[in-house]
């Protein structure tokens, strides 16, 4: 098959997905670990622009842990963690907000705008998108680590209606205005649920869920809530993947139709996952017969 035939076949394969998802809402969570490589970042932005141009309604939620660590180090502020959660005092919170809402957020918006689409930079405070509260993390006081009390999607829906791409930093506030550092996976998951999103896509620096972490070819392509519970109980899902899986389960239980975990360092992984038959990562599918109670999953097992 020559190159022209291959290109034609790719377009034909993508066509039913373009037709199916036109007008659908996708929430894309862009992880800090996947942001380190500028080339990968530019490819992902190109994928987002492509999906927007074919009629998808996109919301981007981002974290930025490595960048936060970098700036705390430059300021000679020690990064402190407990069980993988960043202990967030007042000074650390100021740096977190500065880096997420002031630096990373505006960089992503600029990249989108430079490609001809309309990105709008926000954080959870804007339009009271997120109402936060202090997270309960056992007996340890984690400072200004927050969890989501409620989501108001009105501003996001208004922007989507006008064909903007909201880019949301994972910072929120409570009813008194106190600012909290919130895990970006859970921010993306709760926003996806509030929007009735077709898909939640977690862009990371890992291929997805592996049946054997030492075997890259053991990628689990499709799974569901019951199977995820089994993988968690067997310890196959561990460390930083646990909060991603927990937020995925919560999202599915609240009506998001599918959740995907993909490796954002692979060229055009977002397009490959969404517009091809075989995909490139792990896909979690909703099954009503095994719907779980939301209180089975705690916000305390979160890495920020």
UniProtKB/Swiss-Prot annotation:
Pfam families documented for this protein: AA_kinase (PF00696)
Function, as annotated: Catalyzes the ATP-dependent phosphorylation of N-acetyl-L-glutamate.
Organism whose genome encodes this protein: Cyanidium caldarium (Red alga)
One example GO MF annotation: ATP binding
Site, Transition state stabilizer: residue positions: 29, 244
Pathway where this protein functions: Amino-acid biosynthesis; L-arginine biosynthesis; N(2)-acetyl-L-ornithine from L-glutamate: step 2/4
Name the UniProt record assigns to this protein: Acetylglutamate kinase
CDD domains attached to this UniProt entry: AAK_NAGK-C (cd04250)
PANTHER family named among the record's database cross-references: N-ACETYLGLUTAMATE SYNTHASE, N-ACETYLGLUTAMATE SYNTHASE, MITOCHONDRIAL
